[in-house]
């Protein structure tokens, strides 16, 4: 009996389609057992990766870890045939496929695709007119909503504050300066304007908490930037959300998220794990049971599928333009260290507790230290 253990993050978007795959996949592969455990969203995005690779065959993780994974040889590269590689390249949602590649090897498969998008309560927004298409239109919506005792929403916990800065700051990665000072000052100014019109609990929110609040209360009309979660677009016996492209002509700035699935080099069943990962990421499974079980597929075929969009209230079609042009964070070793150290500073700046110029100095100094010096944190 071959037993595979996998590690997901603790949201139905991740574990739902993984749990649903166990029965049919094991039935088609006698002698195989599969078990999925879960960890928090924070641990998925910023927690230590090294220790979990000793306990699991498969891990679902965030793509900025790729540089450290490749440098340390922590995962088994997917040595695919030319035909398989072309298939994944054609089926990539935006830069999802590219985000798990480094040094000429593919270290994970894109099992889930996401980026920062806009969202709203259709029943609340209808009284205010069409969707805003620019920063100024979002501010006008926020002012009008505030007069009615309603708010914008904006996830502002440190992780999301940093992601917002990357979306609006136009990073350029030219060696010594990650984001130009004037771009940081402009982005901080815009985000402070949005924060002033956002729900008072926004500093406590990640996207999940924001969306949970939106479906449980009637006081948040619109969110201009947050990582999309298809689960909140399914109609049910509760208010539901609709999702849209971000309200900026420079939609290329929207930060790419999503998740990859990789195989630990410490796995005793590497080929079985690779085969299972290929099944989970196949277009056939992704546009069928994967999305029906609450997943957000990493397959372009699924995003463009008519039935998938009918099931999800048009979530994928309504945000495809943004994710196709989304910004791919660096994947060099040390980037997770940079991000983790900078996130609290970004949150402080958006809260008005740190000057934008000082934020620029800190971010670029930490970038130089982690990019060219000795990282202060590692995946191990």
Q: Over which residues does each language-model region extend?
A:
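Short helices/loops that flank or line small-molecule/ion binding pockets
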Residues: 44-55, 124-125, 143-144, 207-220, ...
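Extracytoplasmic/periplasmic solute-binding protein
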Residues: 107-109, 137-179, 220
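Long, aromatic- and glycine/proline-rich binding clefts that accommodate carbohydrate-like moieties
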Residues: 291-344, 348, 373, 377-380
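Glycine-centered hinge/linker elements that transmit conformational signals in sensory
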Residues: 176-207, 246
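Hinge/lid segment of periplasmic solute-binding proteins
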Residues: 66-117
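Conserved N-terminal structural module of periplasmic/extracytoplasmic solute-binding proteins
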Residues: 1-65, 366-380
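A ligand-binding cleft/hinge motif common to bilobed small-molecule-binding domains
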Residues: 64-70, 215, 223-239
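Extracytoplasmic/periplasmic substrate-recognition and gating elements
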Residues: 234-296
């Amino acid at each position: 009996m071959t037993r595979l253990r996998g590690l997901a993050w603790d949201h139905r978007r991740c574990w739902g389609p993984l749990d649903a795959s166990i029965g049919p996949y094991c039935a088609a592969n006698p002698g195989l057992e599969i078990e999925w455990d879960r960890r928090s969203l924070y641990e998925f995005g910023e927690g230590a990766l090294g220790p979990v690779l000793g306990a699991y065959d498969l891990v679902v993780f965030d793509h900025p870890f790729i540089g450290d994974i490749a440098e340390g040889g922590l995962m088994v590269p997917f040595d695919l045939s030319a035909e398989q590689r072309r298939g994944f390249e054609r089926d990539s949602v935006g830069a999802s496929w590219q985000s798990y590649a480094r040094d000429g090897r593919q270290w994970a498969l894109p099992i889930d695709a996401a980026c920062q998008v806009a969202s709203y309560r259709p029943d609340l927004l209808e009284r205010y007119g069409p969707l805003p298409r620019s920063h100024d239109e979002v501010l006008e919506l926020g002012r009008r909503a505030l007069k009615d005792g309603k708010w914008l929403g904006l996830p502002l916990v440190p992780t999301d504050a940093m992601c917002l800065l990357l979306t609006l700051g136009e990073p350029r990665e030219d060696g010594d300066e990650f984001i130009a000072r004037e771009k940081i000052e402009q982005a901080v100014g815009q985000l402070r304007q949005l924060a002033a019109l956002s729900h008072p609990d926004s500093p406590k929110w990640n996207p999940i908490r924001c969306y949970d609040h939106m479906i449980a209360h009637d006081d948040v009309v619109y969110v201009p930037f947050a990582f999309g979660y298809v689960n909140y677009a399914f109609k049910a016996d509760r208010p539901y959300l609709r999702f849209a492209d971000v309200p900026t002509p420079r939609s290329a700035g929207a930060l790419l998220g999503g998740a990859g699935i990789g195989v630990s080099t410490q796995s005793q069943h590497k080929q079985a794990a690779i085969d299972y990962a290929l099944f989970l990421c196949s277009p056939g499974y992704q546009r069928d049971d994967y999305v029906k079980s609450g997943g957000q597929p990493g397959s372009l075929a699924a995003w463009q599928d008519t039935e998938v969009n009918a099931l999800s209230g048009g979530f994928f079609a309504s945000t495809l333009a943004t994710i196709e042009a989304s910004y791919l964070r660096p994947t060099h070793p040390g980037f997770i260290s940079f991000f983790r150290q900078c996130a609290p500073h970004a949150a402080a700046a958006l809260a008005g507790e740190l000057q934008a110029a000082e934020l620029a100095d800190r971010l670029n100094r930490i970038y130089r230290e982690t990019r060219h010096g000795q990282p202060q944190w590692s995946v191990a």
